[in-house]
């Protein structure tokens, strides 16, 4: 550079090779020089060295000439470079001189500072001491004001600032001011306010975590209570005041102010307790305070509900109030759980504890157990067991009232129970669904199954309640079935009292199954016991009403009852006969269905009962003619009414039981379907490995079988009465009596009316129709059937038979409100005897063939021949005419 700072032109114009090119050029020149030196030193010949020397000299001269030419060509640039070099050299010299001067000045300063160092050090020490004294005095003043400052911050609920003040004061007392005498009073005062601060923080947390969630739900009740009742209770009055002031709404963590209070409180506790042990101790203490507050709030909740429902000593609550209480407690615990869940997140972050929610639900379970125990009347049972267990240990002294006795030494025995209704084990029905949801919520929150509350309820249900229900059911069913009024027919009701009582028991058990669905299998087993006992009892009742004939071959047959078995009972007990009769159309028509017509024609009724009449006449016709006696009949109308009531009661009972089973919830049905049971019946038969619904259905079907037997027995019995009264009409008798009909017809009509009067108010219309429909067809068939046993009939006897048929028809029509046209056929049968001789009967057979069967026409012809004075004594007269009749009938076919 020159003096003006400009860059030399020649230097700027010169071409500078690239670094790679310069490296290659230098490498080539160096290699050439080394080769020359090597050749000069290694050449042995002098001539060769001379040649090399001359070549080098030539090259040197050429290089010198080239340099001179270049210098000459760039003379101006060279001069500028030299000038620039001289300028730079002069500047460097000046800088070196100035640096030398600075070095000399620094040496001078150093020497001067070393001279004043001792004086400055002395002054610095004096200043530091003065500053330290001032700071100590300021800290002492701050420490003296710390108690009042802490108290002021506590009153403003600025817990974090108060905790910081406590920490700073402790650090001063235990640190810089530890050697200062006379601070013990201040230290004690600060510790006292520290305890107050901790208590205040814990109270605030308990209030936000427990009190406010509980009171939020109580405020809704308080708003509905009249003012004069609110003023009677201090707690209700305080809640009402909160409600009016608007401060009764529960704080939520979503609320910024509430969250800041919680965060401030937790951070304050974290500041106050430095060690993990101290923090855990305070969290445990906080949870214990929360547990005590839960117990207190439950008592307050019961008080508020009592006042709201106007419950006092003169007006007891019921299970509805208990259900409302448990629902309210469940809602309160849910609200408190939400608060604890969000509080637990802060505690885990600040204090390192993860069991806040778990601890809360443990306390909640304990509190719920107390409430449940007091309302289920569990404690008296436990106290009774304790009394029995400690009866042998008699106390010599009592210390409850001594001065050294603890305040809560006997609190458990004198604590007022927080109950809203009369304690009873059956209260579990209304509260178990709520408890079940609480148990599920608890297990979900504490991640433990089963929870303590579930174990408590399981112990109560399995060890106490099920056994109590079983014992009470046993005693109640004993009273329902063994009492004198159990099987006595009521005058204004068709259902037996025992049936209604047992059904009520079954409804109670079904209510238990639905309410306590987790133990549905246990209560369903009790249900089966009730049904089995009832089936055994009804079987005994039916057996007593239908005794069997004693077996003469038995040695103790004389000691057996002498009451004979009735024909209807024997036929009903016969499986083949009963199965046959129940397979007939009239039996199926007895059950009302949408396909059953409301009103049937006489033709339909006759067609339904035609086959039955044939069966009865075929089995009972000859016996009735020869050996049927009044002892074969049921003549006591109370028994008749009892059979009807038993049928209707058991049918009604079976339908109700099926409806109870059908109304069970789906989850209960699914549980019972997987529960297998074994049932022992009265006859020793076992219902083994059946599901509960199947076993119940089996018991119901067995009861229905008894009911069907009762109805079938009534159906057969009234027909046996017809056989009994109409069979004697076939015997010879004096026709000189002036009575229109024979006494047997009158007796039959009387029996039919008695049957109808006793059955019409008990049996349903369809069942009543089953009993009486077809009697006209049967009586008509009996008149015609017994005509084969009638002796010679005079004209008066013929008329008498016609009047008997008409008398039966008249009496039966009054009952059925139908003409009973089948008896018109019987009357027409005997009318043919009045108007025709045997040959005349043969003449009209083609006309009457459709009205009577071939057998009946044979009966008619035989009776006509027997009644004819001339033909009755002629040998072969009947056979000849029977051949003619058969010929006519064959031609008709």
From Swiss-Prot:
Pseudocoelom. GO terms for cellular component: exocyst; growth cone membrane; synapse. Keywords: Exocytosis, Protein transport, Transport. It comes from the Eukaryota. Disulfide bonds: none annotated. InterPro entries: Sec8/EXOC4, Sec8_exocyst_N. The keyword Transmembrane helix does not apply. GO terms for biological process: chemical synaptic transmission; exocytosis; Golgi to plasma membrane transport; protein transport; vesicle docking involved in exocytosis; vesicle tethering involved in exocytosis. The keyword Secreted does not apply. Residues 1-27 are annotated as: Disordered. PANTHER family: EXOCYST COMPLEX COMPONENT 4. Component of the exocyst complex involved in the docking of exocytic vesicles with fusion sites on the plasma membrane. Belongs to the SEC8 family. This is Exocyst complex component 4. It comes from Caenorhabditis elegans.
């Amino acid at each position: 550079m020159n003096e003006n700072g400009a860059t030399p032109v020649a230097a700027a114009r010169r071409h500078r090779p690239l670094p790679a090119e310069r490296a290659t050029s230098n490498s080539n020149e160096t290699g050439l020089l080394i080769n020359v030196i090597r050749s000069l030193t290694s050449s042995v010949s002098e001539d060769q060295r001379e040649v090399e020397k001359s070549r080098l000299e030539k090259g040197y001269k050429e290089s010198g000439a080239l340099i001179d030419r270049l210098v000459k060509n760039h003379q101006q640039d060279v001069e500028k470079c030299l000038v620039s070099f001289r300028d730079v050299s002069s500047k460097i010299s000046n800088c070196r001189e100035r640096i030398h001067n600075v070095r000399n000045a620094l040496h001078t300063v150093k020497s001067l500072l070393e001279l004043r160092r001792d004086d400055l050090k002395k002054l610095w020490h004096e200043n530091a001491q003065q500053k330290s004294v001032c700071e100590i005095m300021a800290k002492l003043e701050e420490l003296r004001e710390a108690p009042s400052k802490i108290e002021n911050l506590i009153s403003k609920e600025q817990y974090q600032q108060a905790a910081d003040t406590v920490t700073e004061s402790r650090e001063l007392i235990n640190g810089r001011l530890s050697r200062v005498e006379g601070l013990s009073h201040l230290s004690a005062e600060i510790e006292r306010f520290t305890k107050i601060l901790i208590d205040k923080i814990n109270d605030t947390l308990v209030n936000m975590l427990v009190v406010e969630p509980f009171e939020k739900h109580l405020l809704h009740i308080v708003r509905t209570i009249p003012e004069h009742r609110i003023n009677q209770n201090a707690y209700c009055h305080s809640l009402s005041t909160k409600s009016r002031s608007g401060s009764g709404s529960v704080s939520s963590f979503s609320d910024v102010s509430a969250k800041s209070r919680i965060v401030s409180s937790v951070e304050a506790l974290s500041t106050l307790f430095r060690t993990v042990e101290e923090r855990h101790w305070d969290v445990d203490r906080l949870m214990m305070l929360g547990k005590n507050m839960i117990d207190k709030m439950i008592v307050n909740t019961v008080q508020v509900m009592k006042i709201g429902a106007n419950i006092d000593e003169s007006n007891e609550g019921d299970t509805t109030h208990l259900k409302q209480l448990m629902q309210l407690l469940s809602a309160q615990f849910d609200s408190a759980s939400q608060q604890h869940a969000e509080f637990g997140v802060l505690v885990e972050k600040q204090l390192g504890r993860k069991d806040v929610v778990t601890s809360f639900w443990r306390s909640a379970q304990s509190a719920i157990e107390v409430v449940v125990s007091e309302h289920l009347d569990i404690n008296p049972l436990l106290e009774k067991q304790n009394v029995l267990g400690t009866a042998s240990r008699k106390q010599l002294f009592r210390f409850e009232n001594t001065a050294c006795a603890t305040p809560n030494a006997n609190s458990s025995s004198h604590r007022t129970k927080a109950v809203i209704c009369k304690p009873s084990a059956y209260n579990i029905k209304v509260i178990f669904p709520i408890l079940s949801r609480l148990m599920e919520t608890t297990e979900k929150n504490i991640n433990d199954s089963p929870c303590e509350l579930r174990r408590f309820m399981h112990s109560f249900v399995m060890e106490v309640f099920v056994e109590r229900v079983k014992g009470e059911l046993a005693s109640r069913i004993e009273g329902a079935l063994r009492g004198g009024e159990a099987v006595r027919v009521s005058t204004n009701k068709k259902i037996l009292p025992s049936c209604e009582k047992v059904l009520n028991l079954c409804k109670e058990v079904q209510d238990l199954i639905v309410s306590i669905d987790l133990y549905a299998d246990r209560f369903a087993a009790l249900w089966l016991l009730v049904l089995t006992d009832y089936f055994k009892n009804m079987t005994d009742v039916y057996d007593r009403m239908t005794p069997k004939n004693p077996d003469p071959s038995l040695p103790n047959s004389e000691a057996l009852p002498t009451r004979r078995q009735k024909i209807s009972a024997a036929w009903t007990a016969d499986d083949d006969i009963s199965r046959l009769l129940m397979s007939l159309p009239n039996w199926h028509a007895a059950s009302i269905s949408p396909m059953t017509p409301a009103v049937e024609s006489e033709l339909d009724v006759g067609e339904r009962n035609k086959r039955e009449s044939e069966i009865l006449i075929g089995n009972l016709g000859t016996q009735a003619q020869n050996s049927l006696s009044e002892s074969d009949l049921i003549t006591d109308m109370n028994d008749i009414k009892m059979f009807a009531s038993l049928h209707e009661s058991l049918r009604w009972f079976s339908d109700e039981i099926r409806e109870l089973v059908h109304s069970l919830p789906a989850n209960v049905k699914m549980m019972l379907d997987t529960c297998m049971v074994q049932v022992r019946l009265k006859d020793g038969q076992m219902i083994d490995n059946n599901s509960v619904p199947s076993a119940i259905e089996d018991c119901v079907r067995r009861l229905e079988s008894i009911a069907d037997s009762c109805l079938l027995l009534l159906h057969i019995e009234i027909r046996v009465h017809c056989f009994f009264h109409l069979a004697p009409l076939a015997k010879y008798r004096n026709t000189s009596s002036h009575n229109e009909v024979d006494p047997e017809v009158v007796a039959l009509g009387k029996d039919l009316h008695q049957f109808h009067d006793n059955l019409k108010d008990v049996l349903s219309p369809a069942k009543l129709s089953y009993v009486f429909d077809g009697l006209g067809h049967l009586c008509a068939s009996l008149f015609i059937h017994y005509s084969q046993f009638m002796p010679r009939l005079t004209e008066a006897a013929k008329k008498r038979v016609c009047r008997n048929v008409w008398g039966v028809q008249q009496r039966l029509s009054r009952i059925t409100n139908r003409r009973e046209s089948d008896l018109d056929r019987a009357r027409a049968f005997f009318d043919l005897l009045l108007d025709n001789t045997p040959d005349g009967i043969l003449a009209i057979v083609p006309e009457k063939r459709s009205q009577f069967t071939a057998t009946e026409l044979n009966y008619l012809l035989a009776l006509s021949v027997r009644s004819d004075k001339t033909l009755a004594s002629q040998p072969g007269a009947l056979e000849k005419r029977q051949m003619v009749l058969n010929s006519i009938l064959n031609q008709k076919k």
